[in-house]
Amino acid sequence: MQRADFHFDLPDELIARYPSETRSDCRLLCLDDATGDIAHRRFTDLLTLLAPGDLLVFNDTRVIPARLFGQKASGGRVEMLLERPLDAHRGLAHLRASKAPRPGTELIFEGDVHAVVEARHDALFELRFLGETPMIELLENHGHMPLPPYIDREDELDDRERYQTVYARREGAVAAPTAGLHFDTPLMEALRERGVEMGYVTLHVGAGTFQPVRVDDIREHHMHSEWLEVDETLCRQVEATRARGGRVIAVGTTSVRCLETASQGQEDGHIAPFRGDTDIFIYPGYQWRCVDALITNFHLPESTLLMLVSAFAGYPQVMRAYRAAVAERYAFFSYGDAMFLNRSASSHPFPENSHA
């Protein structure tokens, strides 16, 4: 299976650089799993697409203002993007500089924030932030929201709110679980009144989510690792949903990765509590265990996220839906429109299993 199989042409003007004025005011492309038919709807139509007894699973990670600009103490500009907090004062980060800083190098960022490079781990640098103030607090006060590279603009004050879900609570992500950005409080309340249940997992999205697949044969791709937690409460909610005949509906690909990781080694449809790192790579041929339906944004050509969606709803159907979305001028990527997909039971031309 080749990376080029997941290519599609996307005009630059279809990349959303700003969010819609209202979170839930966006388009929703619906793909029928049985017929492959495509319907063009609004996101608020979820009120009719979801049934009482269904379970929506959200990722409650909170995006850190993880980008800082500054310089080395010896001179020379440097840009930092935190990848993962290690403790209250240390973190793993990407550094962009004309010359990679060595261990012992002091960095001075905006707001007189000082950090020292303690070690290098492949492409990541281990930083220790100086002083008594915790690293996360320093970033909240002086950091910039880490907008994806394809948004191609500086972050603005409004991004502090809009590049964050309304239910975000556990700090640790450096990219938003973007399918959840469409849910506002009125829509969530209306769904609850309809009898739709809601549960939460946590996956701290790393900057690796934007790394391209560099190999031609996607089976040779090594997926980046991200930390997640699926707790006992969510496991009980999934079991109860199965018992009443409802659907487990993942809000975003990060929720999919949580649920499918927690389902490894379990009977079909069941999950167990899980806390730790996952590098699960889902592409066509994957044997689904837990997720019945998916709400997701439109993803980059040749990306692992597009491969996951193709595994879920069928490669030919998804690629045809993407071509239709381009023709109908849907907005793409993090601040763009969304899709609603049911899991396809049909076979597809790529029978190989994925690996975890």
Curated annotation (Swiss-Prot):
Q: In which pathway does it act?
A: tRNA modification; tRNA-queuosine biosynthesis
Its Enzyme Commission number? 2.4.99.17
For this chain's UniProt record, which GO biological process terms are given? queuosine biosynthetic process; tRNA wobble guanine modification
Listed under subunit, the entry gives: Monomer.
| Matches recorded under NCBIfam families | PRK00147.1, queA
Q: Which protein family is it in?
A: Belongs to the QueA family.
- Which protein are we looking at? S-adenosylmethionine:tRNA ribosyltransferase-isomerase
Tell me which species this is from.
Answer: Chromohalobacter salexigens (strain ATCC BAA-138 / DSM 3043 / CIP 106854 / NCIMB 13768 / 1H11)
